[in-house]
Regions:
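Structural signature of hydrophobic alpha-helical transmembrane segments
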Residues: 11-23, 67, 71-81
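Helix-coil boundary and interhelical linker segments in multi-pass alpha-helical membrane proteins
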Residues: 57-67, 123-129
Length: 129
């Protein structure tokens, strides 16, 4: 909420627009960055939405396009689950896996799942454009 209230959203939106990244990729990258740094998928989703909304609101996307962008954000929010994520520890403890094994299995599975979901969202967004 601090990031949203501080007005960093519009500034970040302008900076990302200046890079020329498509909005679907921007949504994925923002959510993934927050997820990797902070660990929570929920926080990653909400933060990414708060940061990209100023840009998205100006572009008049349809409901279907917004849904596709939501899929991109959701995908980014679950990639690279590691030691700062509660799910990482739950999986490891319930399965009896070591930290190294959990990184090889859980982290890889989450990354593949999130990336695949985001790619589907990006394709859907392009088809709806």
């Amino acid at each position: 909420q601090v990031l949203v209230d501080s007005g960093v959203g519009p500034a970040l939106g302008e900076a990302l627009t200046g890079l020329g990244l498509p909005i679907a990729i921007t949504c994925f990258v923002l959510a993934a960055a927050v997820r990797i740094i902070q660990g929570s998928a929920t926080v990653a989703c909400l933060t990414a939405v708060g940061l990209v909304m100023p840009v998205i609101e100006q572009l008049n996307y349809s409901g279907a396009q917004m849904a596709a962008l939501s899929i991109c954000i959701a995908g980014g929010s679950i990639v690279v689950s590691h030691v700062n994520d509660a799910g990482f520890w739950l999986f490891g403890k319930f399965t009896g896996a070591s930290e190294a094994q959990t990184l090889k299995t859980w982290t890889m599975m989450e990354t593949i799942l999130g990336t695949t979901g985001a790619i589907v969202g990006m394709i859907a967004f392009q088809l709806l454009s």
